[in-house]
């Protein structure tokens, strides 16, 4: 299927201050967005796609000046694809605190004339949803046909159905969780510690020093990436294969240089990530992950937390995802069923772990395609 082709982001400016869950206020902020497809006359065919930790507004298509800049969910969104832009108007929003153009730690603090750095206020999933609602308002969209996301994006989709129940017809929540486990919070803490202990971090003010805490950011990404892959997938891709600079494939070099293919892969992923991502943003987003827990205000009762939702739901998980295991998705399903909500659930047998939600798997894509066909029939798309 064809890509949506050349796309261009747009920057939306908001003068009305946004009060955050922490009590801090952000004024005069901007959000970078991309849109695909056409909004129909009734404004009933809009779909919001929420991004995960290291992604952005650039969901699909390519930029004219960089043919390699394919959107992070290009296999999912586009003409004739599961989320068909011939039928739906799709919006991608770069969240507050990110490093791809929306107001965040790299932005200039008007009170100092310098980047916010670590002084940028902590944000939450709920803060992002409120900011996204203002984007919807700017487009004149009163109700989304669907809000969709995977991983952290799925948390935002779920939060939308809780916070703006009358504005979400369908919630599509993929490879996600109603809250992080202690183990997941621990992974995030180790990743943050790697960044905070990097001498180049400078208390978050590394911009003024002309450096980036790349060593810490690289380790943080390596830790995260391990959790995104399944044991079987890593065994299939790498096993215990050696990668020696001298070409030898069957002998150790008895040093601490890279020897195994999996080591080489993780270092490559870490280096690539450290080149384009911002360390302060990584700290912010992982903390937003930690804080997400809609049942907290209901004494941990997820059924009570979801009692006032109105959307219909598609919840999907992957068999080998151990970061956000299928059991976590089933918690959401049970709470929704307890509230007699309309829920479709699928656990897809896929070998690729948590990252499976980003990949082109026929069973997975057929599921999403069929669900959007149902939505299209409802809204006349």
From Swiss-Prot:
A GO molecular-function descriptor: homoserine O-succinyltransferase activity
Extent of the signal sequence: none
Active-site annotation: 151 (nucleophile), 321, 354
Amino-acid biosynthesis keyword on record: yes
All copies of domain AB hydrolase-1, residue ranges: 45-360
Catalytic activity: L-homoserine + succinyl-CoA = O-succinyl-L-homoserine + CoA
Keyword DNA repair: no
S-S pairs: none
Gene Ontology biological process: homoserine metabolic process; methionine biosynthetic process
Site positions (Important for acyl-CoA specificity): 323
InterPro entries per the UniProt record, alphabetical: AB_hydrolase_1, AB_hydrolase_fold, HAT_MetX-like
Amino acids binding substrate: 221, 355
Enzyme Commission number(s) from the entry: 2.3.1.46
Compartments where located: Cytoplasm
Any single Gene Ontology cellular-component annotation: cytoplasm
UniProt-listed Pfam families: Abhydrolase_1
The protein's role, per its UniProt record: Transfers a succinyl group from succinyl-CoA to L-homoserine, forming succinyl-L-homoserine.
Similarity comment: family membership: Belongs to the AB hydrolase superfamily. MetX family.
Record's subunit section: Homodimer.
PANTHER family: HOMOSERINE O-ACETYLTRANSFERASE
Protein name: Homoserine O-succinyltransferase
Native source organism of the sequence: Burkholderia cenocepacia (strain ATCC BAA-245 / DSM 16553 / LMG 16656 / NCTC 13227 / J2315 / CF5610)
